[in-house]
């Protein structure tokens, strides 16, 4: 039988130190973020000056990660990076749900120990996060390491009169404990539901928010759980805080409690872990759009019913669609992370996943990946050319040290507008166009040192903006991955483009040598019309994507 234990089974990165000086940028005064509970974009003010606490619901590690999972991770990674660029100390908690009905069922079907399966897929998720440049969380707690926290929280809810223990004919606790929704008048505030005893009301709200399906087509967030369908419930809306074990549950998937042997309900896990690491109230609770109801609605209710304040702001990332429809069974494994990475570089996949504002649906298509590859080519081309012109690149330390106050105003305005990544990306490419213009003028400038300083300033700004989105090609993990960031490896598409343009430039050079300037101009005009800028210099002609 499992044992209630103190939280010891989790990963911790560097925790923010209270001794570290805080230098919040002036740009932070303009930050506005959406709040699901209020349905409004509002000015962000941290609960503690200079610090931000964020809890994001992580994966239920039952199977391999798919693009929908990682989209949410990338979205909140960008949110986190913007807070860091603004100068805040950020405590970022992302949990791992490693005990769950589906984990138990799938492990049994595969002849595996449930905990071994959970750990195996947890590592797959970690590998996907790392490969796609998602920063490791400050704390990554596993549900199984926090049973005592959950039991304590449930006891507080019971003591406050907002839950009930189911007993058998002899008056002994069965292990089933439910939250009493009728006792909590604030239930429904997150998703703006009316208090009603009709279960259809909650179902209707859930339906309006879209289907809760994963890549296998299964109902991931609202599974048919015998505990939640039990006739022992006082109200159809009541949900399980603790669940009695099924006959098929392994002995090591059961924990002893004052209200019987069993295992936790899904919602209580996040309430317990967020309170453990972020305390009484924190700034932001995030997760995928599917989690608004019932998970986050239930989580908010039980946390407050235990006597603790809820998160000050709730943020939800929209899901990934294909041909206008949310990922579903019909897409099979085509959207699994390994299958996508087998065909595209990690930088390109990250760019595609983070290419729109987090609340916007993300349409996943071949065209989106082609556009992401083109973006990479434009970015890497400028960075490489600028580095050659300057004789070197700004260091990673210098790039990371650029404050939000020193970034281009249009980029800051976009990021402060509820993390409008589309606008921020447009600002980056505006800066790249300006930088390419400076590079084209470099050879003709009499004030060469001033000209180089301007190029360097443009290069530093571009890389700092990219870094804020987790996309600086000269940062980890892109450099270690051997991507084209360092010029040592190119995508097949870029290599083909390079070869075709080189052939055209050679033909143009031959025409100029033969004084056939009409043909030379014709070649240049054709390349320009195709979006390729040609620049002639003492060492020959170079090209860049406009």
Curated annotation (Swiss-Prot):
Region (Disordered): 211-236
UniProt keyword annotation of Cytoplasm present: yes
Co-factor requirement: Zn(2+)
UniProt-listed Gene3D superfamilies: Cysteine-tRNA ligase, C-terminal anti-codon recognition domain, HUPs
Catalytic activity annotation: tRNA(Cys) + L-cysteine + ATP = L-cysteinyl-tRNA(Cys) + AMP + diphosphate
GO molecular function: ATP binding; cysteine-tRNA ligase activity; zinc ion binding
Family: Belongs to the class-I aminoacyl-tRNA synthetase family.
Protein name: Cysteine--tRNA ligase
Organism: Bifidobacterium longum (strain NCC 2705)
């Amino acid at each position: 039988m499992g044992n209630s234990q103190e939280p010891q089974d989790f990963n911790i990165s560097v925790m923010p130190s209270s001794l570290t000086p805080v230098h919040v940028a002036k740009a932070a005064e303009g930050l506005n973020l959406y709040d699901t509970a209020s349905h409004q974009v509002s000015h962000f003010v941290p609960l503690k000056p200079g610090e931000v606490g964020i809890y994001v619901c992580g994966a239920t590690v039952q199977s391999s990660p798919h693009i929908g999972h990682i989209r949410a991770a990338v979205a909140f990674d960008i949110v986190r990076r913007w807070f860091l660029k603004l100068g805040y100390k950020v405590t970022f908690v992302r949990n791992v749900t490693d005990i769950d009905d589906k984990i138990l069922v799938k492990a049994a079907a595969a002849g595996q120990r449930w905990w071994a399966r959970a750990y195996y897929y947890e590592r797959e998720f970690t590998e996907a996060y790392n490969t796609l440049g998602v920063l490791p969380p400050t704390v990554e707690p596993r549900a199984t390491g926090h049973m005592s926290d959950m039991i304590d929280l449930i006891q507080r809810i019971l003591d406050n009169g907002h839950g009930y223990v189911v007993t058998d004919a002899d008056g002994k606790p069965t292990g089933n404990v439910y939250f009493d929704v009728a006792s909590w008048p604030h239930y429904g505030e997150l998703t703006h539901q009316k208090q009603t005893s009709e279960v259809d009301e909650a179902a209707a709200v859930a339906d309006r928010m879209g289907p809760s399906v994963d890549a296998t087509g299964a109902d991931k967030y609202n599974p048919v759980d015998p505990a939640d369908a039990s006739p022992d419930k006082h109200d159809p809306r009541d949900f399980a805080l603790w669940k009695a074990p099924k006959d098929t549950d392994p002995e090591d998937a059961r924990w002893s409690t004052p209200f019987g042997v069993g295992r936790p309900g899904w919602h209580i896990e996040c309430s317990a872990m967020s309170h453990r690491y972020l305390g009484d109230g924190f700034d932001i609770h995030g997760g995928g759009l599917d989690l608004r109801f019932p998970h986050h609605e239930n989580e908010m209710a039980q946390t407050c019913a235990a006597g603790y304040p809820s998160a000050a702001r709730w943020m939800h990332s929209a899901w990934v669609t294909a041909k206008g429809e949310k990922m579903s069974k019909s897409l099979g494994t085509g959207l699994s992370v390994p299958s996508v990475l087998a065909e595209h570089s990690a930088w390109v996949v990250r760019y595609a996943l983070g290419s729109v504002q987090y609340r916007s649906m993300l349409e996943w298509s071949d065209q989106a990946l082609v556009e992401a590859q083109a973006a990479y080519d434009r970015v890497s081309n400028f960075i490489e050319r600028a580095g050659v012109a300057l004789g070197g690149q700004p260091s990673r330390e210098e790039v990371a040290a650029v404050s939000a106050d020193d970034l281009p105003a249009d980029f800051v305005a976009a990021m402060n507008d509820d993390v409008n990544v589309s606008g921020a990306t447009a600002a980056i490419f505006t800066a790249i166009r300006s930088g390419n213009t400076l590079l084209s003028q470099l050879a003709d400038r009499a004030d060469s040192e001033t000209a180089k300083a301007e190029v360097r300033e443009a290069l530093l700004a571009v890389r700092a903006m990219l870094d804020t989105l987790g996309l600086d090609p000269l940062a980890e993990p892109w450099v270690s991955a051997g991507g084209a960031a360092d010029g040592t490896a190119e995508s097949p598409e870029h290599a083909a483009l390079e070869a075709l343009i080189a052939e055209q430039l050679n033909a143009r050079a031959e025409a100029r040598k033969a004084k056939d300037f009409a043909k030379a101009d014709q070649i240049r005009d054709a390349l320009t019309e195709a979006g390729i800028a040609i620049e002639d210099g003492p060492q020959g002609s170079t090209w860049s994507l406009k």
